[in-house]
Amino acid sequence: MADLSGVYDQTRRRISDFVGSLSEADQDRPVPAAPGWTVHDVVANLTGDLAAIQTDDFPGSFFAAVGEPDEVAKLNAWTARMVEERRDRPVRDVLTEWEQLTPAVMAMLRGEQPLPSGLPPFVDRVLVTDVAVHEQDIYGALGLVRERDCSALRIGTSTYVAGIWLRLGELAPPRFETDEETYQAGQGEPGATARTGRFELFRALSGRRSPEQIRAWEWSADPEPYLHLFYVYGPRTEALVEP
């Protein structure tokens, strides 16, 4: 199994080096994948995640009801607060805070220190998935194609698919066929098989593709019953096209 703390920190370093090298104008560039946010805000969110773990302020209830409107609203308010708290600080200061918070949280993920009681046991995968999502948000905002086959993205894809399994209810599991790997969200005969690229699958599972974009994949059956499963952070109506 991948060392998830190592994968997280490797991705953090990559983002920090990249964002730290940007001009102030590019650090303030809007991020289409995260409407209303800039590159600065994305870094603030990632930093706030670790601060919240250390202070036991992580919204554990969200993971018990993923995608439910009330929980999505709570999560969005929590995220907005952590971003707002860092909005007036220079990016370099936020990156420094992120770096300083990382060792203690990584020790928790490795089992060397106790995690706060409200966190789910798979919080390590949640953090790796989140950092992979936001790394691509940043690259997409700048029109760049980078790190689309990295460990964090692969782990994030399998984590999102596992999350669909937990939310299927009475639906037969969907199967996703990509050139790199096949994923199935549950056991038994699939109710529908979709074929697309792994990067597209990852971005869709993180809510970065519109329903129309997902419908346009090659489906073996009607995709409609499955579309809501792609939006754990709330619906997306506008298409997001990335290079």
Report residues per predicted region.
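Short, helix-capping/interhelical loops that line the mouth of catalytic, cofactor-
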Residues: 1-3, 51-110
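Non-cleavable N-terminal signal-anchor transmembrane helices
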Residues: 1-20
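Structured surface interface patches that mediate subunit assembly and partner/cofactor docking
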Residues: 1-4, 29, 58-68, 111-243
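Active-site-proximal cofactor/substrate-binding loop regions of enzyme domains
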Residues: 7, 17, 36-55
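Aromatic- and histidine-enriched alpha-helix N-cap/loop-to-helix transition segments
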Residues: 10, 34-45, 126-133, 196
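Short amphipathic alpha-helical/adjacent loop interface patches that line ligand
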Residues: 12, 46, 50, 102
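Non-transmembrane alpha-helical segments in soluble domains
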Residues: 16, 43, 54, 95, ...
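Helix-loop segments that flank and shape redox-cofactor active sites
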Residues: 16-38, 59, 107-119
